[in-house]
Amino acid sequence: MVKVVKIWKGDLMMRSKSLAKNKDLQRKVLCSLLAAGVMSVCISGGDVWASGTIKDQDMIITSNMDIVADDGEFEGVTNRYAAIGHTQDSTMTVTAKPGVMVDSVVTATNGRAMGIVNVGNGVLNVNGNYSFALNADTVRGIRNNGYNDLNLNGDFIIKAVSKGKNSNNDVVVGVEAFNGTNITVNGDKLNIDITTDNARIIGVQNFNNNGETITFNSNDTSIKAVQIGTGSVCQGVLAYQSTTNFNGNVVIDLKADQV
């Protein structure tokens, strides 16, 4: 038996108006949440989430995410942009679930681009698989500064491009620790790829970090740096009064006028 349902024109118009009102309300709520920084935006049919800088908050990432850095307020200035950053005296944890990829783009004009930065006196844990595309005159792939710990667990791919022309002021660093900090990297892969016109290149910098340690436990660690111009310095590992440990397979490949 076939059941026939009749919808009168008036009912259809009322339902259409009701749906329109609901969509308008949802749109207003979404805009309010975005303005308040409460949530990110889902694009591409729900497969990829877009976010600004993840800063001073715990987060569990359950779907692929694209981060476009929009916060440059780190270390007392306003032109040091980062994809993931921590500035507090507390513990912050960002976890991307298994199978999830987080891609980040950080661009700074007349400033610094950083992938991950921890500059408070707390602990920053970043777990999962991440890639960072950094572009600025001065670049830091991973930076830890100021009596704290930075723990990375997963696969990390860092591609840094610097247009810096002044080797005295423009510096590109893959991983660095300063002022009483420890960095531990665990996982299958750490891949750092640096290209610059004429900035100074440092693959790993463990400087002014008396008694502290950077430990690379990744199964495969690759640090590649290419300087296109001439007259600058390219250094693989720079350490002073500190310890840098490499466990696993390590490749450090430097190409520059002075190595």
What are the residue ranges of the model-derived segments?
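Surface-exposed loop/turn motifs in large extracellular/passenger domains
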Residues: W49-V259
